[in-house]
Amino acid sequence: MNRFRIALIWIAGVASSPFAAEPPATQRFEVAVAPGLLPGPTDGRLLIVLGKGDGEPRRNIGRTGMNTPPVLGADVDRFAPGVVGVVDHGSEIFPIESLSKLPAGEYQIQAVFDWNPDLRLPDAPGNLFSKPKKVMLDPTAGFTVKLELTEQIPPEKLPADSAQVRFLRFESKKLSVFHGRPMYLRAGVALPREFATEPDRKFPLVVFIGGYGTRYTIANRVGAFLRSGTPMVILCLDGAGPYGDPYQVNSENNGPYGDAVTQELIPHVEREFRCFGDPRARFTTGSSTGGWVSLALQVFYPDFFNGCWSFAPDPVDFRAYELIDIYSDANAYVNRFGFERPGMRLINGDTVYTVRHETQLENVLGRRNSWWRSGKDWCAWNAVFGPRGDDGQPKPLWHPKTGAIDRSVVETWKQKDLRRVLESNWKSLAPRLAGKIHIYVGDADDYFLNNAVRLLETATRRFDPPFDGVIQFGAMQGHGYHPVNEMKEIADRFQKAGVK
């Protein structure tokens, strides 16, 4: 018997042996859609959330941390009644490594179909979801769970107006031209008590921007700022757009949000709510995302606003994009010492999660398994700061799996590096920004945002003419550092401007 024949007999024997390895068990979710919910065959992202206990697991979509309910994601193209969307063991998953690692037990399962192209939110109008379903799952035994999308997020409806809060939604011509479809700006407006009692009086305008993804409905809460004897109109911008928070500036991917806000929204609000319409009577403020936006609006539109109060701003110098130096680092996930790069810390320095952990979640949420289409933080930054790819989508700064940084996109990012913008244009900007910039950050910021502010502050020491502004650090203070009453300071600056 020759060796080749012996080998064949041995292989056949192993294949038929009772001790041969069993094929891996299949873990699979099959999702159908009820008739009448989609306008036609529709592309989107199908998400499966595996919760514990009662309630709706979909409410947990977007949470980070190792204890968050697992969520899986897969694309479904041309989804329609009669088409089965499949999410299985090969799909992207968070926070565990794979579906085979899921602990056996009872789960409350819910499916979501995210397809709204204008608002990258799981609960955006038109998105579909299933009713929760309790199922026993054991990955070692395998399973197939069938779900049906029967529920739909209702059409957008503005909250009810009140005596001191009004809400707006109107079509932006600039954004509609860019996107080739109707695009809308939404805003909340908090009015001072004097608006009703002094009908001939005009007011300064404060543009308020909240933390990441804060919606315009925050106007119901910011009205409390007006109780301190600072009569002004507060305009609350909306932190939702095609790639998450649009950051209210012009970008290659989101379109001309900055121009839409300054040339369409603000003039409309000033006419409607008796504002002065004078640059000396316009101000910006916000924290975190709002900290960056308030500063960016002041820098990119230096003659349009009379001051910004920026708290814990998102990275203002891309040498410290949190802990990533986009100009010299090779990898977003691993630092130059070979260790995983933290993405959030406690005040004592302990790591809460890493950049890789955050991006794993965004790869689940993003179409084509891509963090740069997730609608979350890294996605939004990439869309605002980076270039548009040949496919019409944002070009990613780094590879979704390896974290390797693509140096070819960095040139576009420089245009939104606020330290570089100020440095490169300081001769022109200095007189137009005199006394207008106020930045505050804790030097133990949860997201390492103090590092970029420190680099900016160091750069301003070399400015000629000298920098006329405030950059203040709070010792051992985290992301909530807020040492001044900005409304009082804004009121004081407005009074000194002598606007009549």
Where in the sequence are the language-model features?
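Non-catalytic cap/lid and distal C-terminal segments of serine-dependent acyl enzymes
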Residues: 51-500
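Mature N-terminal segment immediately following signal peptide/propeptide cleavage
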Residues: 23-54, 167-170
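Beta-rich accessory regions
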Residues: 22-23, 461
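Bacterial N-terminal signal peptides
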Residues: 5-17
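Selective for proline/serine-rich intrinsically disordered segments
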Residues: 16, 21-22, 190, 202
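A short, compositionally biased domain-edge/stem linker segment
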Residues: 17-19, 32-35, 149-157
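N-terminal secretory signal peptides that target proteins for export/translocation
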Residues: 1-3
